[in-house]
Regions:
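Conserved small/polar residues in nucleotide/adenosyl-binding loops
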Residues: 135-139
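Short, low-complexity interaction segments enriched in Ser/Thr/Pro/Gly
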Residues: 5, 22-26
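Helical hinge/lid and interdomain linker segments adjacent to catalytic or ligand-binding clefts
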Residues: 25, 29-122
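Cysteine-nucleophile active-site neighborhood
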Residues: 125-128
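Metal-dependent phosphoesterases centered on the DNase I-like endonuclease/exonuclease/phosphatase
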Residues: 132
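Bacterial N-terminal signal peptides
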Residues: 10-19
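Bacterial N-terminal signal peptides that target proteins for export
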Residues: 1-10
Length: 139
C-alpha cells in the first residue's frame, strides 16, 4: 500500500513539474514577411499575427517589403534572431543578399511556414521551390 501512495505522489509531482516546464517555455521568435501579395496582405498579416500570438506560443515581428514595383535593394533581412519565418508574401524578387541569408537560415535548421499564395512567390528560384516542396527537375 505504501508503494502505491508513493507512486501516486510521484505521478502528481512529475505532472506538476511537466506542466510548469511546458507553460514556462519561451515563445517562438517569429518573423512574418509580407508587403506584396495578390491577396489582401494588409489584413492577412494582422490576422496571422493575432492567431499566432493568441496561442501564447509565438512572438511575432513583421518585415514589410516595399510596394510592388519599387526598389527592393534595401529589403535585406536578418533571419538569425528567429526560430520561425512565416511567409505571407507573393511579389517582387528579394535582393540576392536576402535570398542568400534565407537559404542559409533554412540550411541551418530555421523553420518556415508558407502561407497560402506565398508558394508562388519565386517561381524561378529553384531553392525556394524546393523549400516549398514544389520543385521537380522537369519543371
Amino acid at each position: 500500500m505504501r508503494h502505491l501512495h508513493f507512486g501516486k505522489l510521484f505521478f502528481v509531482v512529475f505532472s506538476l513539474l511537466l506542466a510548469c516546464t511546458v507553460s514556462a517555455r519561451k515563445p517562438i521568435k517569429t518573423l512574418l514577411i509580407t508587403g506584396q501579395n495578390n491577396h489582401n496582405w494588409q489584413v492577412s498579416h494582422v490576422v496571422l499575427k493575432q492567431i499566432l500570438e493568441n496561442s501564447g506560443r509565438f512572438d511575432v515581428d513583421f518585415a514589410i517589403s516595399p510596394e510592388q514595383g519599387k526598389d527592393m535593394s534595401g529589403f535585406v533581412l536578418d533571419f538569425s534572431p528567429y526560430q520561425l519565418v512565416v511567409l505571407d508574401y507573393n511579389g517582387d524578387s528579394w535582393p540576392e543578399e536576402t535570398n542568400r541569408r534565407f537559404l542559409e537560415y533554412v540550411q541551418n535548421g530555421g523553420g518556415v511556414v508558407i502561407y497560402h499564395a506565398a508558394d508562388n512567390a519565386f517561381s524561378k528560384w529553384p531553392e525556394f521551390n524546393k523549400i516549398c516542396l514544389l520543385y521537380t527537375s522537369d519543371a
